[in-house]
């Protein structure tokens, strides 16, 4: 029937649905809608005017069928092409008890019939402040039966009453709600999903009106689990040729929604009557084809969006060949290392000494040899002589290094199979080069490794990198909170998954404030007593009502002088994909009001066998201290 179905957004094609309030002949309508190019149909499960009475006789026992037969469509069509809609008269949060009780019964009847049909999704309206009973009825429905429908909450981007043009200017308006204006509808949603305990089955169908809110409100919505965007035909403008188009502001919003792979639902009558209705859909296709192309980082990260991974522990574990292979493909990292080594060699060896001064260069953690090759290229580029040691503790990777030496490098490179902290070097190094950084800079124990190796660095020797700093930023993300919650393991503390960091390509999230520096390490470390434990307090101003789910971690490093690498969004090295950000979750989401400050405390702790992080929020409210004593997560020395 249709090329794609509900939940089928992906690839370059826009996935779209048609929203109708009345469907007399379902099979014919579905055929017509598919012909126009739509993938699914949103329609009431029951006739909108067929109000049922569940409480009082005699209407309670009205004869005849309650709604159309399921036999009108095949099971597969119900499963993939129809999104159910709740009858508009159903108001489970009515203050009138009879209406409320009747609505509850009718809502359950419609939800149960939707489950019986196997509908992939059901559309329910959120159009007022108090939706508590709606949340209870829906949550009870989700927890009974074995159905798997998604529930799309239809939320307006801007509340309809805020668009009324009959309000007299400067006249006092009566606001009964705690939040007004742009904040209102997000608070409806936030309170509703909190009541539903962040159920993964409940998502947003965001209705976009002619007026758009400010950018920070849109940014916040894009951190929510938006599965569909509802576009009324009335928001489309008309171009010179009579076709429907959207304003520049709306286009920018559509581009951002396309990145989240939402499905689009067109609602309303044809406002461009001389054109076919499918022209609305064709315009969305046009926008999809003409959106900015993905950059190298986005292409590499495709498929990893919001996918949680445990951080690597290359000190404790030996990496696999494929892991090395992925990192070696990074086009930026090794060219920056080569540039840093090149500059360092020129700085250490004057032109007149280039034939006599041989610099001893040690690659610590050589892996399969990319830094050795970068060093050799740098020496050639600088026209300087070097003697190279490639030190690697992974015996499997050493095999690759020895093959390189035999086939390419020759006597210029000495391969050493040893842990750099235990190696007794035959001579001291002029330059030590390493790539031991993780997504949070020091989380793969670069400080401990380089401190253990610096005794064979000359007093005037150079470490590349010379310095690195971790950064933290507060984020809101329903998606990531639910992903972490789902990581619960059978034999562990039920909240252990919230006490460990995850490497993740952040996608469906909202950053609440700019990243701030956390811990800095410098090499060589000339302190008489080296201590890599740290404690920092960071305060983040927040300009919007929101909810805190955790902290994104990034890093910047100075390789040598002005040669840097960064995954901090503001300074991200273009095209570099070796590191995704790190996520530090918190156990309980924390509501944050506009103008409040988020205060977080971070500790880096260690003993003789391991290193770990602890963290706690202390404003606007206090959280528990996460991961005390490293009980849920440590990094092995």
Swiss-Prot record:
Activity is increased by EGF, HGF, FGF1 or FGF2 treatments, and slightly decreased by NGF treatment. GO terms for molecular function: E-box binding; histone arginine N-methyltransferase activity; histone H4R3 methyltransferase activity; methyl-CpG binding; protein-arginine N-methyltransferase activity; protein-arginine omega-N symmetric methyltransferase activity; transcription corepressor activity. It catalyses: L-arginyl-[protein] + 2 S-adenosyl-L-methionine = N(omega),N(omega)'-dimethyl-L-arginyl-[protein] + 2 S-adenosyl-L-homocysteine + 2 H(+). Residues 488-494 are annotated as: Dimerization. Residues 308-615 form the SAM-dependent MTase PRMT-type domain. PROSITE patterns: SAM_MT_PRMT (PS51678). GO terms for biological process: circadian regulation of gene expression; DNA-templated transcription termination; endothelial cell activation; Golgi ribbon formation; peptidyl-arginine methylation; spliceosomal snRNP assembly. Keywords: Acetylation, Biological rhythms, Chromatin regulator, Cytoplasm, Golgi apparatus, Methyltransferase, Nucleus, Repressor, S-adenosyl-L-methionine, Transcription, Transcription regulation, Transferase. Residues 465-637 are annotated as: Beta barrel. Belongs to the class I-like SAM-binding methyltransferase superfamily. Protein arginine N-methyltransferase family. Forms, at least, homodimers and homotetramers. Component of the methylosome complex, composed of PRMT5, WDR77 and CLNS1A. Found in a complex composed of PRMT5, WDR77 and RIOK1. RIOK1 and CLNS1A associate with PRMT5 in a mutually exclusive fashion, which allows the recruitment of distinct methylation substrates, such as nucleolin/NCL and Sm proteins, respectively. Interacts with PRDM1. Identified in a complex composed of methylosome and PRMT1 and ERH. Interacts with EGFR; methylates EGFR and stimulates EGFR-mediated ERK activation. Interacts with HOXA9. Interacts with SRGAP2. This is Protein arginine N-methyltransferase 5. It comes from Macaca fascicularis (Crab-eating macaque).
């Amino acid at each position: 029937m249709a090329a794609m179905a509900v939940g089928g957004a992906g690839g370059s094609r826009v996935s779209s649905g048609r929203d109708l309030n009345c469907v007399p002949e379902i099979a014919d309508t579905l055929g017509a809608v598919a012909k126009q190019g739509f993938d699914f149909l949103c329609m009431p499960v029951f006739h909108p005017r067929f109000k049922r009475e569940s409480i009082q006789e005699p209407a309670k026992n009205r004869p005849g069928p309650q709604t159309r037969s399921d036999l009108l469509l095949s099971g597969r069509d119900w499963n993939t092409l129809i999104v159910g809609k709740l009858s508009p008269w159903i108001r489970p949060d009515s203050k009138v008890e009879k209406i409320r009780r009747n609505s509850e019964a009718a809502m359950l009847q419609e939800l149960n019939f939707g489950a019986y049909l196997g509908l992939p999704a059901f559309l329910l309206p959120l159009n007022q402040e108090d939706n508590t009973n709606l949340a209870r009825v829906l949550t009870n429905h989700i927890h009974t039966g074995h159905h798997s429908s998604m529930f799309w909450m239809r939320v307006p981007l801007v509340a309809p009453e805020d668009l009324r043009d009959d309000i007299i200017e400067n006249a006092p308006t009566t606001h009964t709600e705690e939040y007004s204006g742009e904040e209102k509808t997000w608070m409806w949603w936030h309170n509703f999903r909190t009541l539903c305990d962040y159920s993964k089955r409940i998502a947003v169908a965001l209705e976009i009106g002619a007026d758009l809110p400010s950018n920070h409100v849109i940014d916040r919505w894009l951190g929510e689990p938006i599965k569909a965007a509802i576009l009324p035909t009335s928001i489309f403008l008309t171009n010179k040729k009579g076709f429907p188009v959207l304003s520049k502001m709306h286009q920018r919003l559509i581009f951002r929604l396309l990145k989240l792979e939402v499905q689009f639902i067109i609602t309303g009558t044809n406002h461009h009557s001389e054109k076919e209705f499918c022209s609305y859909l064709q315009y969305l296709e046009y926008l999809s084809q003409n959106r900015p192309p993905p950059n190298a980082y986005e292409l590499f990260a495709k498929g990893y969006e919001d996918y949680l991974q445990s951080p690597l522990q290359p000190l404790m574990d030996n990496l696999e060949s494929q892991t090395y292979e992925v990192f070696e493909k990074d086009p930026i990292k090794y060219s920056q290392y080569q540039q840093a080594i090149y500059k360092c060699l020129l700085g250490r060896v004057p032109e007149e000494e280039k034939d006599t001064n041989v610099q001893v260069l040690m690659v610590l953690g050589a892996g399969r040899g990319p830094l050795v090759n970068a060093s050799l290229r740098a020496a050639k580029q600088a026209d300087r002589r070097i003697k190279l040691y490639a030190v690697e503790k992974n015996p499997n990777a050493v095999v690759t290094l020895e093959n390189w030496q035999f086939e390419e490098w020759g006597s210029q490179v000495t391969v050493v199979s040893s842990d750099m902290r235990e190696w007794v070097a035959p001579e001291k190094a002029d330059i030590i080069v390493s790539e031991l950084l993780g997504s949070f800079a020091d989380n793969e124990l670069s400080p401990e490794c380089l401190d253990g190796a610096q005794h064979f660095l000359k007093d005037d020797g150079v470490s590349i990198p010379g310095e690195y700093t971790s950064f933290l930023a507060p984020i809101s993300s329903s998606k990531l909170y639910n992903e972490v919650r789902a990581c619960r393991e059978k034999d562990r503390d039920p909240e252990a998954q919230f006490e460990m960091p995850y490497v993740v390509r952040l996608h469906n999230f909202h950053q609440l404030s700019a990243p701030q520096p956390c811990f800095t390490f410098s090499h060589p470390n000339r302190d008489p007593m080296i201590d890599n434990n740290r404690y920092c307090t960071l305060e983040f101003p927040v300009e919007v009502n929101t909810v805190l789910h955790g902290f994104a971690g990034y890093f910047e490093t100075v390789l040598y002088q002005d040669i840097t690498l960064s995954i901090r969004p503001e300074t991200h090295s273009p095209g570099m994909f070796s590191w995704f950000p790190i996520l530090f979750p918190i156990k309980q989401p924390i509501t944050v009001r506009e103008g409040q400050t988020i205060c977080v405390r971070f500790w880096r702790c260690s003993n003789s066998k391991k290193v770990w992080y602890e963290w706690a929020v202390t404003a606007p409210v206090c959280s528990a201290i996460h991961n005390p004593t490293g009980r849920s997560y440590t990094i092995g020395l």
